[in-house]
Amino acid sequence: MQRREFFQHFLKRAGIGAGALGAATAGLVGYYQPRKEVFDTSGKNNDELAEKLTTPKKAVVIGGGLAGISSALELARRNFEVTLVEASPSLGGKLTGWSIEALGEQFPVEHGFHGFFDQYYNLNEMFASAGIGSDMFTASPGYPVIFSDRQVEVFGQTPKWFPFNILSVVQQSKRLDIMSFLKDYPGLWPVISMFRYQYDRTFRDWDSIDFMTYCRRGEVLPAFIDTVLHPFSDATMNRMEVLSAAEAMRYFHFYFMGSPEGLAFRIITKDCMSALIEPLERKMTSLGVRVLKGRKAQNLVMQDGRVTAVRLDGAGAANGEVASIPKREVPVTGWLQHMSDAGIPVLVARRGASWVALDGRCTHMGCPVAPEVSTGGFHCPCHDGRFNAEGLPVSGPPKAPLPRLDVREAGEMLVIGQASSSSSPVVVTAEELPCDYCVVASGVRGTRELIALTRPGNSGFAGQVAALGEADPYVVWRVWLDRPLPSADFPFYTVSGYTYTDSITFYSSFQQPFIDWAKRTGGCVVELHAYAVAPQDVRPEPEIRATMLQELHAMFPESKNATIRHEIFMMQSNFTRWAPGDHAKRPGVETPYANLFLAGDWVSTKAPVFLMEAAVFTGRMAANAISAKESLRQKPLPIVPMNGIFA
């Protein structure tokens, strides 16, 4: 659409005609607005179909994050016999949490701060269904952005009505002004184009380039990039320089430009586990869902193009070799770190004339562990878990040891396989879960491993899953300081222009038990979050912490006088990658296998959803697809408008 056509289209849609200024204003403000819609793929007779099965069928859901929980809840309500399998000892995925001992007390911790936006329609519905009320949330007082080279910009709760929402953002900015924004005609067009989001066209035209290139080619006003687009797009957990321009447009459409809800979001007054995940787990069990925590799905059992069972890890569950490694690669002392073709990290060492091998996945969340020279054991940087040289947990959230693997010599090679009951110090009996339907709702890494070990016959599907990627690693550094930081007026800040810090959260200002601890001790609890660390900035932990501390001092100078009484540093990589070109290879909810479905924020869907809402939405989509197979009523799913207001 050319500029002239666009303005003709705009005037027509807005109701603007010659000599009709009043009607134009009414048309613009009244009719031409984003409105909540419904994503409905059911047929015309959907309401006439039964809601539940008369005879239960078995469904296995793999993954206990938001996608798996939402799918399990919907299937259980339809009278399916649901088993949910989660490798971690707790549910929640990226919302999971655990307790630590610090300063003589127990504190809950998690992966980092989460804001809950009003347009998370499906997520909020799921919370409400589990009895999670408004008392667990408080409204954020604003959306402040700290810049490295100028004053803080505070974006308050913006109006929900277009064009006042975007004009409000510009008006609230100290750096931007309406006239300079409107005068920058060449750079205004690509911004307006972001209001033209339309799934097919947007991904056809813009998925081949990154968002920064899109902005620079379009000559977007640099001040608008620095003040609005860059800090907000970083929250995708993908750097603007490697984020697909099409995905960025979907993101901004969902969160702001196409949302009927403005910038409003809520924060929780308790930790994620007690406020959200535990009530959801109780709701699942009340509906009859069997929840298996600490059990890993090893592979799917396939027969005649269907999944007949899900095989869980355990003694006797071997499914061929895990890895084959030349003996010469194993060092004389220390451990060899090896990544198998299926993406499984393996640790191998010499023990005299014999060999020992461990599964290198942390038993907390499956992140790769690394040998720690100072202790002789292993460290998981994701959640600061530690294991001794035998693989037994010694600190942090992991409770189970690293699984022992079998090692067999074959000439000059070592063949690494799943442990037999005689070689593993901890024996877990293998189990096969028969199923009529299966939903894979794991994260990217877990799904890749599962499908690789399943070895499905459809190479196209296997290739799609294998191509899934994770974003650059992110860092969460939470510190307990011995004094408050009085200049912190907000509980949460977005940050722009620093090497690492992308946001900073003051937990002691809004969440228990940190509020009480701060009152008793006179201190504060602060969390610095780096959303996506560029490859050139991935450095040893002490260097990153030192730099982030300097950034804290720059943002809040009074912190220079504070002493860190306790700290937790986590660095991990488990958020979905949204790189240029990824979209075309991304698998959808339905697969080439009649009873196998996928769910997660990484799953392709035409609906304008993102992050947590995408996880819950695709979980519900999977349940709807299964319902269609059984001629059951499908649930219409609320969404923001499918298209931008200028589409």
UniProtKB/Swiss-Prot annotation:
Gene deletion effect: Mutant lacks chlorobactene and all its derivatives, and accumulates only gamma-carotene and its derivatives. The growth rate of the mutant shows no significant deviation from the wild-type growth rate at any light intensity.
Binding site for FAD: A67, E86, A87, K94, Y120, D601, M612
CDD domains found in the cross-reference section: Rieske
Cofactor: FAD; [2Fe-2S] cluster
Catalytic activity field: a carotenoid beta-end derivative + 2 A = a carotenoid phi-end derivative + 2 AH2
Pathway: Carotenoid biosynthesis
Cofactor notes: Binds 1 [2Fe-2S] cluster per subunit.
Residue span, Rieske domain: 322-416
PROSITE patterns (alphabetical): RIESKE
Residues given in the record as [2Fe-2S] cluster binding sites: C362, H364, C380, H383
InterPro entries (alphabetical): Amino_oxidase, FAD/NAD-bd_sf, Rieske_2Fe-2S, Rieske_2Fe-2S_sf, Zeta_carotene_desat/Oxidored
Keywords carried by this UniProt record: 2Fe-2S, FAD, Flavoprotein, Iron, Iron-sulfur, Metal-binding, Oxidoreductase
An example molecular function term from Gene Ontology annotations: oxidoreductase activity
Keyword Transferase set for record: no
SUPFAM superfamilies, per the entry: FAD/NAD(P)-binding domain, ISP domain
Role summary: Involved in the biosynthesis of chlorobactene, a carotenoid with aromatic end group. Catalyzes the introduction of two additional double bonds into the ionone ring of gamma-carotene to produce chlorobactene. The reaction includes an intramolecular methyl transfer from position C1 to position C2 of the ring.
Protein name as annotated: Carotenoid phi-ring synthase
